[in-house]
């Protein structure tokens, strides 16, 4: 078994959609980024890449490459699943924490889990998403942006 840790953060931006876990969440702001800026999916991507020793999302999908401009992060996650499979691993479990002051995410978490599970071809009960605030502290507390942490557990395929 291997463990990977992931982290991502993005600034708030006007005139952008807020996408987390592949789900569009109604909010006055979205997040800045070269892709759809889905910080939750990006952190999960980094956790998986770490678990298989394949760098990070910026290395695999550089923001200097126009092919990734505006791309759905779920498509990137799908490509990473292929890498996990090719390296002889299977995803066992994912845990993540989204840190933002608002909006409240609880109503959207089941849909996020379902979308991520669908892409990763695994049961949604093997994916956990927690939503926290930063109690008004730091850049998240000042509502300048969002931060996400993720951990992925992978195991060697037994084929």
Curated annotation (Swiss-Prot):
Reactions catalysed, as given in the entry: 4-CDP-2-C-methyl-D-erythritol 2-phosphate = 2-C-methyl-D-erythritol 2,4-cyclic diphosphate + CMP
Kindly state what the record says about how the cofactor is bound.
Binds 1 divalent metal cation per subunit.
Which coenzyme or cofactor does it need?
a divalent metal cation
Binding residue positions for 4-CDP-2-C-methyl-D-erythritol 2-phosphate: 8-10, 34-35, 56-58, 61-65, 139, 142
MF terms from GO for this chain are: 2-C-methyl-D-erythritol 2,4-cyclodiphosphate synthase activity; metal ion binding
Q: Where is this site: Transition state stabilizer?
A: 34, 133
Query: What broad class of enzyme is this?
Result: lyase
Q: What is its EC number?
A: 4.6.1.12
Its subunit composition reads: Homotrimer.
PANTHER family, per database record: 2-C-METHYL-D-ERYTHRITOL 2,4-CYCLODIPHOSPHATE SYNTHASE, CHLOROPLASTIC (PTHR43181:SF1)
State its role. Involved in the biosynthesis of isopentenyl diphosphate (IPP) and dimethylallyl diphosphate (DMAPP), two major building blocks of isoprenoid compounds. Catalyzes the conversion of 4-diphosphocytidyl-2-C-methyl-D-erythritol 2-phosphate (CDP-ME2P) to 2-C-methyl-D-erythritol 2,4-cyclodiphosphate (ME-CPP) with a corresponding release of cytidine 5-monophosphate (CMP).
Q: What is this protein called?
A: 2-C-methyl-D-erythritol 2,4-cyclodiphosphate synthase
What organism is this sequence from?
Answer: Syntrophus aciditrophicus (strain SB)
Classification of source organism: Bacteria, Pseudomonadati, Thermodesulfobacteriota, Syntrophia, Syntrophales
């Amino acid at each position: 078994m291997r463990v990977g840790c992931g982290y991502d953060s993005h600034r708030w931006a006007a005139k952008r959609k807020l996408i987390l876990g592949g789900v569009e969440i109604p909010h006055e702001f979205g997040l800045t980024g070269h892709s759809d800026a889905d910080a939750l999916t990006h952190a999960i991507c980094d956790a998986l890449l770490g678990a298989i020793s394949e760098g990070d999302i910026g290395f695999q999908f550089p923001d200097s490459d126009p092919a990734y401009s505006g791309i759905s992060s779920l498509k990137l996650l799908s490509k990473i699943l292929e890498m996990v499979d090719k390296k002889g691993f299977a995803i066992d479990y994912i845990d993540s924490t989204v840190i933002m002051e608002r909006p409240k995410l609880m109503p959207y978490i089941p849909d996020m889990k379902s979308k991520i599970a669908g892409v990763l071809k695994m049961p949604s009960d093997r994916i956990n998403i927690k939503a926290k605030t930063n109690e008004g502290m730091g850049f998240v507390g000042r509502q300048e942006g969002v931060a996400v942490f993720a951990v992925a557990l992978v195991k060697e395929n037994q084929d």
